[in-house]
């Protein structure tokens, strides 16, 4: 009599291993521990929660939604069960290692960032680990006004929390007299210390194999300091000099000079570490100092208070705690401003009026960039490199993201509408329908 197999993925473990769906390099990357089986409990927390076939397939199903058009994702999906089973087999045998992904520089409004794209073969177990162990274990220790990279929160919520804090401040003091301290960390992700990260996480996650998996991921972030002298390496290690990942290349197994600092922008583990790691700072400001009107979005934070001297003193405390964490405050972007003046937080302008109204508006640069983009689209359209329907879809998407926030930018939006209609000889009905039957 044939036995019924409940999970198709379990069949694939005994089958011949297939080649990786994407041509990523498995060399020069850290390996997992030799064994993952807990002899006391039978299975580790990783294997019982995060690395089951069901959990891994769900993780792949969730992460593929916005990137399904990519070739590597489609190849992985063709043999998803076999790829998952292959990973489970490699992890249990202690032969699994992370793959080297694509690296590139991204210019974001003139600021260059070094991005490391994690291959899909590694993104699946990392996503499952984050969803089932990492985030549930660390989220209870995060304050409510820490909104980055968490499900149910995000940048819109953080902007709204700033608005709520301004409104509550006015209700409490019946005035817009006061001050706001805005702070920022220099090269936040590049200078996160691996040992301090593991020490902080180990207080919240007790499973040995989960910690080993985190160490393996962190080790893959190491940079190559072979071109630096011993004195320079020591200065980087002790935090005397600030690390900039743009000046270093990725380390490999042959690299003798590495520093356990820095995490990649692009990995989900990095995002959660960035949210969690300064939690001591959040708790000190919120609980010890009693600052109700405080919020942090990754490396940007603010404190609203009536007393300027209080903010100056707490800034010194923040600097002391940051030095213990190995973080560096960017004093060019850290300042104290009067609350009745307009200030910018997360690319949004805030003004607390004398009547208690909070006026929110997008920065003018947002509309200038879109105007430049539309003029470039016009040239591409005339050269038949872009279709009119594609341009309409892009503008509708941008316009919807601006108008749904209900900011005070009505005139600027109308000016962009008029420019769009003039450039492409369209009417509002064409924008509303989203399709154009005109042949240019």
Per-range role (PLM):
Residues 205, 319-327:
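A common structural junction motif
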Residues 99-101, 295-299, 332:
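Short Gly/Ser/Thr- and Asp/Glu-enriched loop/turn motifs at secondary-structure junctions
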Residues 1-85, 435-440:
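Non-catalytic, polymerase-adjacent accessory regions of viral genome-replication enzymes
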Residues 2, 30, 118, 123, ...:
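Right-hand nucleic-acid polymerase module
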Residues 112-143, 256-286:
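Conserved pre-motif C helix in the palm subdomain of viral-like polymerases
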Residues 171-298, 303-317:
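Conserved polymerase palm-domain catalytic core
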Residues 46, 133-193:
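Active-site-proximal segment of RNA-dependent polymerases
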């Amino acid at each position: 009599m044939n036995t019924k197999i409940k999970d198709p993925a379990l069949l694939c473990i005994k089958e011949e291993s297939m080649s990786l769906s994407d041509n990523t390099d498995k060399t020069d990357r850290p390996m997992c521990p030799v064994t993952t089986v807990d002899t006391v409990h039978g299975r580790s927390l990783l294997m019982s929660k995060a690395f089951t076939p069901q959990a891994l397939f769900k993780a792949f199903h969730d992460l593929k939604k916005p990137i399904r058009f990519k070739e590597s994702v489609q190849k992985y999906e063709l043999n998803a069960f076999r790829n998952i089973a292959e990973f489970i087999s490699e992890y249990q045998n202690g032969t699994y290692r992370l793959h080297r992904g694509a690296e590139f520089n991204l210019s974001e409004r003139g600021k260059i960032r070094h991005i490391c794209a994690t291959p899909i073969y590694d993104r699946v177990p990392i996503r499952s680990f984050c969803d089932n162990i990492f985030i549930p274990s660390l989220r209870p220790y995060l304050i409510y006004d820490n909104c980055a990279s968490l499900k149910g929160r995000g940048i819109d919520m953080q902007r709204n929390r700033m608005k709520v804090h301004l409104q509550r401040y006015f209700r409490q003091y019946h005035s817009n007299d006061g001050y706001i301290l805005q702070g920022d960390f220099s090269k936040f992700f590049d200078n996160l210390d691996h040992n301090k990260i593991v020490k902080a996480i180990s207080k919240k996650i007790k499973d040995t194999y989960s910690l080993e998996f985190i160490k393996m991921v962190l080790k893959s972030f190491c940079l190559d300091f072979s071109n630096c002298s011993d004195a320079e390496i020591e200065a980087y290690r002790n935090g005397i000099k600030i690390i900039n990942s743009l000046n270093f290349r990725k380390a490999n197994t042959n690299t003798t000079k590495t520093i356990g600092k820095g995490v990649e922008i692009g990995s989900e583990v990095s995002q959660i570490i960035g949210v969690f790691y300064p939690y001591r700072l959040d708790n000190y400001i919120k609980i010890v100092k009693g600052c109700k009107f405080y919020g942090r979005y990754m490396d940007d934070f603010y404190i609203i208070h009536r007393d300027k001297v209080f903010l100056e003193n707490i800034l010194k405390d923040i600097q002391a705690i940051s030095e213990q964490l190995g973080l560096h405050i960017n004093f060019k972007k850290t300042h104290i401003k009067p609350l009745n003046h307009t200030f910018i937080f997360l690319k949004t302008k805030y003004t607390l009026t004398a009547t208690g109204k909070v006026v929110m508006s997008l920065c003018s640069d947002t509309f200038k960039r879109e105007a430049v983009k539309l003029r470039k689209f016009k040239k591409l359209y005339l050269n038949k490199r872009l279709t009119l329907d594609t341009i309409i879809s892009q503008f509708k998407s941008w316009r919807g993201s601006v108008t749904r926030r209900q900011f005070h930018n009505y005139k600027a939006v109308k000016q962009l509408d008029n420019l769009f209609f003039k450039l492409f000889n369209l009417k509002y009905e064409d924008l509303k329908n989203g399709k154009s039957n005109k042949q240019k």
